[in-house]
A protein has these predicted regions:
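Primarily recognizes Gram-negative and organellar outer-membrane beta-barrels
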Residues: 4-48, 62-312
Length: 312
């Protein structure tokens, strides 16, 4: 509503003694302007550490959209523009390479009666570990020495989709689809050798293992035992979920409500292990081997149907 301007005396004294004359009604129309904002950061550190992350937001009328990316090797898996959690101890002995990207959109019909929202996210992670150690005189007053090496190669990736359609009003309807997919692999190699004399101090762990692999006891006549353990893990998982919610306002004021939910999952995991130990002393060339393989597949289904009558 629009009124005549207050008199100067009332404005100066901040009083409302004079009644203002009514002029007219005005219908205000909401106008939207286009907005776009973004941020990008990059950094490097010691030990070849680096990170690049950024996000961008877009708003125009009834559409909001955003995108983000986080690329690094500092064990960081947050969503730029959303959260900033930092896990610095996930892989304390190695470097975790992470690539994480995503897109989110929300579309709204004028008047706020119809919405469509979509979230997409993908992530890749990898860990490489090469740990080598040489230990001399592991027992007091002895010449027992050992060397070991641990190699680990781990990779995993994931993809997720969440799409939601919502209709508001006297009748309410919401349909939601959720999809999750992931793959992972993990390879471990562990080597261990025990000697009953001092090992060459000028040879690296890798050089010592290479000599054992080529010559065995011929390379070191004081080699007691040598073990190799290999393990691998392969897995993938898939999950699909559909959810429907509906409600209808009845003419006499009550509500009729319906809900349906269905999900399907498919998981597959393969495990393999191969151990080989050779005892050179005191029993010459006594070999113990162990092999194990396991393949597990699971599929599951579930569904729910519900109906309600709500008295108002």
């Amino acid at each position: 509503k629009v009124f005549e301007q207050s008199k100067e005396k009332n404005r100066n004294l901040n009083t409302k003694t004079d009644l203002k004359d009514y002029v007219m009604d005005v219908l205000l129309k909401k106008e939207y302007s286009q907005n776009n904002f973004g941020n990008i950061e990059a950094g490097v550190g010691t030990n070849d550490r680096w990170q690049v992350r950024g996000f961008d937001g877009y708003m125009k009328g009834s559409v909001n959209a955003s995108a983000y990316a986080n690329l690094n090797n500092v064990n960081q898996s947050s969503v730029p523009g959303s959260d900033g959690s930092f896990w610095d101890s996930d892989s304390p002995k190695s470097i975790m390479n992470t690539k994480k990207v995503g897109v989110s959109t929300i579309a709204e019909k004028t008047g706020g009666t119809f919405y469509v929202s979509t979230d997409l996210a993908a992530q890749w992670q990898g860990v490489d570990l090469d740990e080598q150690k040489k230990q001399i005189s592991i027992l007091p007053q002895t010449n027992i020495n050992k060397i070991f090496q641990n190699l680990n190669d781990s990779r995993n990736s994931s993809f997720s989709l969440n799409n939601k359609i919502t209709k508001m009003g006297i009748s309410y309807f919401q349909f939601q689809t959720m999809v999750d997919y992931g793959r992972s692999k993990n390879d471990d190699l562990n080597k261990y050798a025990l000697f009953d004399k001092n090992i060459p101090s000028n040879s690296s762990v890798l050089q010592l293992f290479d000599a054992i692999d080529e010559g065995g006891r011929n390379a070191f006549d004081y080699l007691q035992n040598y073990s190799i353990n290999k393990a691998n893990n392969r897995a993938h998982n898939f999950r699909l979920r559909e959810n429907i919610e509906m409600s209808q306002a009845l003419a006499w004021g009550d509500d009729l409500i319906f809900h349906a939910d269905a999900s399907y999952s498919d998981n597959n995991q393969k495990l393999g292990e191969n151990s080989h130990i050779t005892y050179y002393l005191p029993v010459n060339d006594s070999i113990v081997s162990y092999v194990a393989n396991d393949n597990t597949k699971t599929k599951s289904y579930s569904y729910t149907l519900e109906g309600f009558y709500h008295f108002n």
